[in-house]
């Protein structure tokens, strides 16, 4: 497995990581046995970057990782573990963002307990609280680092301008953002700012929520995934149009003799040494396809052919609806 650095000051990690939201039922039923098998596959293939959050399954993802590490103590040294906090609920049970020092530290402490570790390798603010100055939040993260509760700090779904403000206070090791062949908005400043500042760009949904694979989600499968059922790119009309476009990409991947997901991952890795994709899946075969993507080096001609069938801006529909956009920062 190729290695990359998790930010200029961070540890070496596998070029390919894993998004552990898939250890919950978000995209369909997940089992502990299936998740353990995925972790075993990762350990066997040198996939070391493991990304989770306190809100994934209300802590279930972290607890499962903790259980796995408890049964395989030697595995702790094989994984670089990242988690997040900052999304909460008000007294009425409605979703809210909370970047206060008290909330972030309390949630990190709870995450450490679920994971069964004294320190995580990377701690993100999951969503930025707009009313709270980001400089203040960075100071909180720096304090948590000084206390030995995390080795590195980051933000998820922030704008390049916010990253620059944050980096003026302390080094930001990683920024997480959706980035793939069907979501290229990070190229409007975030890819560049991360490279300039020595910040890793951790790309979630690198295979476009299944659309950039050989088994894209079909309309009849949407009922089991409420998040995608209301997502603009999966609404009637947009979904069918997107399926039509990606059929050309699947044909290109087949012509290259590679799984479509592997080519999608390889394309992301070609966008910069600081780009680190973290696909999530409940399937061992799909994980093997992603691992294959980290083994492929695309030529200039390959990249040109991909751009020809999936030109920037090709996707039909926004990546989030109005409710889903609460938290992520829009820019450019």
Specify the residue positions occupied by each region the protein language model found.
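Terminal-tail/helix-coil boundary detector
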Residues: 1, 196, 223-251, 255, ...
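Glycine/proline-rich, positively charged
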Residues: 27, 44, 90-185, 189, ...
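Generic structural signal for well-ordered alpha-helices
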Residues: 39, 62, 66, 108-112, ...
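Active-site beta-loop-alpha junctions enriched in small/polar residues
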Residues: 21-23, 53-55, 84-88, 125-128, ...
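Conserved, mostly hydrophobic/aromatic
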Residues: 6, 18, 35, 50, ...
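N-terminal binding-site loop/beta-alpha segment at the start of enzyme catalytic domains
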Residues: 1-79
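Aromatic-lined glycan-binding groove of carbohydrate-active enzymes
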Residues: 186-224, 259
